Amino acid sequence: LASSAASDVYKRQILYRPTRGMVSDHFNTDKKHFGTDIAANPNESVLATMDGTVFLSTYTAETGYVIGVQHSQDFVSIYKHCGSLLKKEGDRVKGGEAIALVGNSGTLSTGPHLHFELWYKGHPVNPEKYIVF
């Protein structure tokens, strides 16, 4: 349901691929994997997928350096396991703007990659339905 509504809204948006690399793990709610993993070179730029405001820029033991961006139309994007963060909470960002660098941070990381999540109205949606990786 959320995915269908998200699709309708997203058709009117310009989305940027969050980093260069290859998909190494897919969105799978059954496995509680609420994002797409993109294997990438360390220090590759992580880009905001759309315009928005950074609401989270922090470090956690499990997910390492994490940045979250609130977008219009009730969308949120989350970027985990970064090597470093380039923006702080409250910063306005443009779609395609570098917000972090790819890394291997956090105990759940298995190598240099970006774990990218997309949420619509509080529900995870499959990023691969909206962005060509």
List the model feature ranges, each with a label:
Residues 49-86, 112-113:
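Zn2+-dependent peptidoglycan hydrolase active-site motif and core
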Residues 45-54, 87-102:
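Short, well-structured beta-strand-loop connectors
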Residues 3, 17, 40, 48, ...:
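Conserved strand-loop elements at the edges of beta-sheets that form or border functional pockets
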Residues 91-133:
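Conserved, short, structured surface segments that act as functional micro-motifs
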Residues 26, 57-58, 85, 102-105:
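Residue-level recognition of beta-strand microenvironments
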Residues 20-48:
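Short glycine/threonine/proline-enriched tight-turn/helix- or strand-capping micro-motif at secondary-structure
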Residues 1-6, 10:
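Single conserved hydrophobic/aromatic residue that forms the stacking wall/gate
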Residues 16, 22-24, 35-37, 66-68, ...:
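Soluble periplasmic/extracytoplasmic beta-strand elements of cell-envelope proteins
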